[in-house]
Amino acid sequence: MSASRHPVLWGFVLAALTISFLTPYLPVAWYAEHGLMENVQCALLGLAALSCLYGYTRLQAQMDRWVWLGMAMVFLVFVVRETNMMRGVLYDADAIWFGVHNRLYGRTLMGAMAIFALTCLILGRAWRWLHHKAMPVLPILAWLLLIGFQYVGERGSFGLGSMGIVLEENSELLVYVGAWLIFWYHGRVLLTSQSSTLKDEKIPCLP
């Protein structure tokens, strides 16, 4: 299995090995809620969203532009998730007056953004990736495994104790790295090598 045939998988492995090597030397405080690791995750997600918007501006095929715009919104949804954006905007008294708990604001914002992202992906017919086998099996399996690790770490299962938060944050970071690698490499190859412009397709409203 050469690196040239599976660049995403090897990039994934390199990121995992790097994080595993550095973890014992990093303070546990960096993994706390809203700590340094979460800021690193937000920075990575923001860069991923910007890279998708860059791809959006570089493509001419209308359906492809929808897909890149939709993926940018997907990454931004995770930015909102990591930052708890819009949660606790109002004082408790104001929230009671509106009859809605503060924490619902963040979920409402993420829901609206997710619906917009899904709409873009549907308009761009993102399932074309599956037909052309652009989505690699091995990186996706590794990605799903990391999501399982994140679930275990978040709940502190198997007596992990304080190491649970370390496992959770490292797994989340690798999930985001994997998502970016999978989309940017395979999406770029597929979406720039094929013309899918149809006369009746609409172009997204962004310039």
Question: What do the predicted segments below correspond to?
Answer:
Residues 78-131:
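Membrane-proximal helix-loop-helix units in multi-pass membrane proteins
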Residues 20-30, 84-94, 122-126, 151-161:
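Juxtamembrane "helix-exit" motif on the non-cytosolic side of transmembrane helices
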Residues 31-39, 95-109, 165-173:
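Short aromatic-rich membrane-water interface segments that cap or initiate transmembrane helices
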Residues 148-158, 167-204:
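C-terminal transmembrane-bundle signature of multipass membrane proteins
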Residues 1-13:
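N-terminal membrane topogenic signal
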Residues 11-15, 41-54, 106-122, 172-190:
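Hydrophobic cores of alpha-helical transmembrane segments in multi-pass inner/ER membrane proteins
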Residues 23-36, 54-61:
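Short, hydrophobic transmembrane alpha-helix segments
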Residues 2-3, 54-67, 124-135:
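Membrane-interface helix-boundary motifs at transmembrane edges
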